[in-house]
């Protein structure tokens, strides 16, 4: 279905069809006259192309517009029944799945499903088997699934389908291997970039042209939208803010270097600082659990914020201040409409957001930052799997 209008039409018409679909993806319904005006193309040409898109199943006539007297024009939008997209956010110990219709509406969402990710073919075969079982439980046929989007941490090349953090050394890209198992197109993406796209299309990034999404989880990542387009960079690896050499410390990052921003501004930094303070004898509602020898998790620390635990607040605020300085630099460079803070640490809410904003006020250029909003993610932990669905739809239609 993805190639229906990409192959059998001339290049100009294919480009116009893509632009029509791009407008529809913004979740706004259009009349023929609206399309004509936006694309600066004649009404007869637009009428013909919209008719072909309806025939292909991508677009639907949604009825007549408005309540004015006289002949009312038809309005058009994406056809939800064109098929389904499955988006998967894969973590080391769990995964989350969203299923959307073609319009991007979520029809199913499940999170924190137990799964052990290792870089082997058996691990990814197990993931494929689970996904096939999952869609069967939802009552969907394999043929109804138009594409799968798979989010992975680390370095991912969206165009080639390779992951450079998992499945290393195999002669085929992960995407190709999974396509053979799932019998549908598979698009892999870096988790932060997918979260960024999900927030941009379906969250608080809607209606802005330039956005930076900062994923503060165990590690630190970033997605960037410039002039309404997701930024990939030359090799597809843009957004590695966690490895910006900003800090003067001796902490060895997971990448093997020292001084990386991630070592001072991430969930792992909060956890490391919290455990260090407990060892020094600082008081916390988690002190007894620590003394018993039980594991203190990052979620334990985040949950302690709700009880106004001073040590947890101190550690989160420290990270927020460091992160805010880095975001101030990003604002000075990109001058975005919006900065969104998401990921696991976003559930810290104002304990993280307020020190970020304070540091931005101190370290950014006021003339640059005064028009930039800084907000917490609207989609929360759904941003990843929803972003995977929306990115896969755009990739399927040749819009990326």
How would you describe each model-predicted region?
Residues 1-62, 68-70, 75-111, 118-143, ...:
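ATP-binding/phosphotransfer module of carbohydrate and carboxylate kinases, centering on a glycine-rich
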Residues 6, 109-111, 119-123, 177, ...:
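Glycine/GP-enriched mid-protein hinge/lid loop-to-helix segment characteristic of carbohydrate kinases
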Residues 99, 155-156, 224:
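Hydrophobic beta-strand positions
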Residues 110-210, 351-362:
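Glycine-rich phosphate-binding loop and adjoining helix at the ATP-binding site
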Residues 153-155, 218-219, 345:
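Short glycine-rich anion-binding loops that position phosphate/pyrophosphate groups of nucleotides
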